């Protein structure tokens, strides 16, 4: 790639110029605030180097919300372009760039980190653990994700964004058809972030299997913990495939290999297969934790034990197995034999069965329950019908013969947005609001929260339901404009109105965070909603102490904390206080991730010397870690007593 220095910064587009100015001003403002209030040491010692799973979870969530804003703006720009025929708001290349970054950001850099953030905050508390199995690795997982996300996101101001779609199909993603650094940003940003996700999968799988408190058998675990465990198993099996695929395509682009190009025997369809062998399990990586969140919320606010617990566990396991047997349904039209299409059509339909089991379990959990219509519960209730719509249309798409009509139309676009927004995004909002007091010590305002819910949910349906009809009328996806005689103007305009309603809803959420920080009553009991059933509600609010539990609880039933409340069990008797061993903070994961970012940035522009320097930095950090003998530290009994006294005041 012959890179021209005068093209280093993207210029000539007022939207990108505005983004560059806002980034510069935001950076200056952050530096000024940290310097003025003398918070640099606090930022380093309390957040950047922390190994506390709760703080890392909050950092994941903050990053995900920022990515939600970026990906949401991309989506609004696409809808603005398609609102009217022959619109010139975006040119074709800019639209393709936004189309690519929107999909990649929303799935890889928003949905996954949001859920991983909630998992970090909640799951160790739910199983009665002091921290995760590998705290150092947890910090490294976050920073590799964050650096990968930042590497991907700087592409729109430095060098140029990828424009081959979020799936980066070959040969469209080849050097001939996608010259420049954009596609390299995609490959290396995802590679670095994917390493962090794989480490998270290993970490939480070990944590759940080996660090549960006394009495917590597998069949006493909360459903969110169960869905997390199965999700981590999927990650461990699926993400190595993505890692290999990204590496092979990187070799094609950077070193002239031909794994996916027709020259020298390469196979473009091999990329499609490898991508979707990872890609469809990825759908369940972001859906299964959402199922767990809704299970916790519905059970709590219906004030009933989850109906069909064993059936729920079985359905989760069935979904995880079938998720690896459906990938070809993404390209029924791309030359498979009838027998191959038939097999994957059957497996795709079959996966709807365990999903349907869960829907009925949630409905029966609410049956005859004393339901409180709180904001989290509203999101859970909205999820069920909207997700069913997405699921039913998914079964329609699973019919290989019919898919020839639906494929690459807006019918498909509407389907996966009904699944991913109604499933994953609704769950992110519900879980965020539900566990918000656990993280920050106060609830979000319910009145403002309900405005957010109704505007966003109604806007979502106004935006995406018309797209089913656009698809049936033949509107293909990925087009940046259309003619006035195509007959798509009215539905596209309605869809755009709905998209901007969703944007307004997000702004209301941001206002709610500010308003609640200023005016909400501080909550210290830990059981913020008064309906807590699991051990996460047995700890204090506003980031529980690093050690989580002054005394590790003993579990005697499925809804452990509810049982303790009913039995009036003393949670933390001082007579049982013992000194607690905790892991030390470390800054090395941060520096290792920066080295990864340096290597990635160098390889994006094919500056191999910079790539080598960055990789040497990564290796050096690993070597130094190998010679580090840090046995952590102990929290004394007196310190535990003082901490618990302050919590109870």
UniProtKB/Swiss-Prot annotation:
Gene Ontology molecular-function annotations: copper ion binding; cytochrome-c oxidase activity; heme binding; oxidoreductase activity, acting on diphenols and related substances as donors, oxygen as acceptor
What is this enzyme's catalytic activity, as reactions?
2 a quinol + O2 = 2 a quinone + 2 H2O
Q: Where, in this chain's numbering, is heme a3 bound?
A: 415
Q: Where are the transmembrane segments?
A: 16-34, 57-75, 98-117, 140-157, 191-209, 228-246, 273-292, 316-335, 344-362, 378-397, 406-425, 453-472, 491-510, 585-604, 611-631
Q: What note does UniProt attach to the cofactor annotation?
A: Binds a copper B center. Heme A3.
Binding site residues for Cu cation: 280, 284, 329-330
Subcellular compartments: Cell membrane
Q: Which residues lie on this side of the membrane: Extracellular?
A: 1-15, 76-97, 158-190, 247-272, 336-343, 398-405, 473-490, 605-610
Q: Which Pfam families match?
A: COX1
Its UniProt pathway annotation is: Energy metabolism; oxidative phosphorylation
Please tell me which top-level EC class this enzyme sits in. Answer: oxidoreductase
Question: Which positions hold the covalent cross-link 1'-histidyl-3'-tyrosine (His-Tyr)?
Answer: 280-284
Residue intervals annotated with topology Cytoplasmic: 35-56, 118-139, 210-227, 293-315, 363-377, 426-452, 511-584, 632-649
Binding sites annotated in the UniProt record for Fe(II)-heme a: 102, 417
Q: What is its EC number?
A: 1.10.3.-
- Any single Gene Ontology cellular-component annotation: plasma membrane
Q: How does it sit in the membrane?
A: Multi-pass membrane protein
Keyword Cell division assigned to the entry: answer is no
- Does Nuclease count among this protein's keywords? no
Q: Which UniProt keywords apply?
A: Cell membrane, Copper, Electron transport, Heme, Hydrogen ion transport, Ion transport, Iron, Membrane, Metal-binding, Oxidoreductase, Respiratory chain, Transmembrane, Transmembrane helix, Transport
Q: What InterPro entries does the database record attribute to this sequence? A: Cyt_c_oxase-like_su1_dom, Cyt_c_oxase-like_su1_sf, Cyt_C_Oxase_1, Cyt_c_Oxase_su1_BS, QoxB
Among NCBIfam families, the record links this protein to:
QoxB
**Family to which this protein belongs:** Belongs to the heme-copper respiratory oxidase family.
Function text:
Catalyzes quinol oxidation with the concomitant reduction of oxygen to water. Major component for energy conversion during vegetative growth.
* Protein's recorded name: Quinol oxidase subunit 1
Which species is this UniProt entry from?
A: Bacillus subtilis (strain 168)
Whichever gene encodes this chain, its name is qoxB
């Amino acid at each position: 790639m012959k890179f021209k220095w005068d093209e280093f910064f993207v210029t000539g587009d007022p939207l990108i110029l505005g983004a560059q100015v806002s980034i510069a001003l935001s950076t200056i403002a952050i530096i000024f605030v940290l310097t003025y209030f003398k918070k640099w040491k606090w930022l380093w010692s309390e957040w950047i180097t922390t190994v506390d799973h709760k703080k890392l979870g909050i950092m994941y969530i903050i990053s995900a919300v920022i990515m939600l804003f970026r990906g949401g703006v991309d989506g609004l720009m696409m809808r603005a372009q398609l609102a009217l025929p022959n619109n010139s708001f975006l040119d074709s290349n800019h639209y393709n760039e936004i189309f690519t970054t929107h999909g990649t950001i929303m799935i890889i850099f928003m949905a996954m980190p949001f859920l991983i953030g909630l998992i970090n905050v909640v799951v160790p508390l739910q199983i009665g653990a002091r921290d995760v199995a590998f705290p150092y690795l947890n910090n490294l997982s976050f920073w590799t994700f964050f650096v990968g996300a930042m590497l991907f996101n700087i592409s729109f101001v430095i060098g140029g964004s990828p424009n081959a779609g979020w799936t980066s199909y070959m040969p469209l993603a080849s050097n001939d058809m996608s010259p420049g650094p954009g596609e390299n940003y995609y490959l290396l940003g995802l590679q670095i972030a994917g390493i962090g996700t794989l480490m998270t999968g290993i970490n939480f799988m070990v944590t759940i299997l080996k660090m549960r408190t006394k009495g917590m058998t597998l069949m006493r675990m909360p459903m969110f913990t169960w869905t997390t465990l199965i999700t981590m198993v999927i990650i461990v099996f699926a993400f190595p495939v993505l890692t290999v695929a990204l590496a092979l395509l990187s070799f094609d682009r950077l070193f002239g290999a031909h794994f996916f190009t027709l020259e020298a025997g390469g196979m473009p369809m091999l990329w499609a297969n490898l991508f979707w062998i990872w890609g469809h399990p990825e759908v369940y990586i972001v859906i299964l934790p959402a199922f767990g969140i809704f299970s916790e919320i519905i059970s709590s606010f219906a004030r009933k034990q989850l109906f069909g617990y064993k059936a729920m566990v079985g359905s989760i396991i069935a979904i995880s197995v079938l998720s690896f047997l459906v990938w070809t349904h993404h390209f029924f039209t791309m030359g498979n034999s009838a027998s191959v299409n038939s097999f994957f059509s059957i497996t795709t339909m079959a996966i709807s069965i365990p999903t349907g089991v869960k829907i009925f379990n949630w409905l029966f959990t609410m049956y005859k329950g004393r339901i409180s219509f709180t904001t989290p519960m509203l999101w859970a209730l909205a999820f069920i019908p909207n997700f069913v719509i997405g699921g039913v249309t998914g079964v329609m798409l699973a019919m290989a013969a019919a898919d020839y009509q639906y494929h690459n139309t807006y019918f498909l676009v509407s389907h996966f947005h009904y699944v991913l927004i109604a499933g994953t995004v609704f769950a992110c909002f519900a879980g965020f609001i539900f566990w918000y007091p656990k993280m920050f010590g106060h609830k979000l305002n319910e009145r403002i929260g309900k405005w957010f819910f109704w505007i966003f949910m109604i806007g979502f349906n106004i935006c995406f339901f018309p797209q089913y009809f656009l698809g049936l009328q033949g509107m293909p996806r990925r087009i940046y404009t259309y003619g006035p005689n195509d007959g798509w103007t009215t539905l596209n305009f309605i869809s755009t109105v709905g998209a901007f309603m969703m944007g307004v809803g997000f702004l209301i959420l941001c206002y709610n965070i500010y308003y609640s920080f200023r005016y909400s009553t501080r909550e210290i009991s830990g059981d913020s909603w008064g309906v807590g059933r699991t051990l996460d509600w047995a700890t204090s609010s506003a980031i529980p102490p690093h050690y989580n539990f002054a005394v590790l609880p003993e579990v005697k039933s499925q809804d452990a904390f509810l049982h303790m409340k009913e039995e009036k069990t003393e949670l933390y008797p001082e007579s049982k206080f013992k000194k607690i061993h905790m892991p030390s903070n470390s800054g090395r994961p941060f520096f290792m991730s920066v080295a990864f970012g340096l290597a990635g940035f160098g390889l994006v522009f094919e500056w191999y010397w910079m790539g080598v320097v960055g990789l040497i930095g990564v290796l050096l950090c690993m070597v130094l870690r190998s010679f580090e003998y840090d046995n952590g530290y102990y929290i004394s009994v007196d310190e535990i007593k003082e901490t618990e006294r302050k919590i109870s005041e």
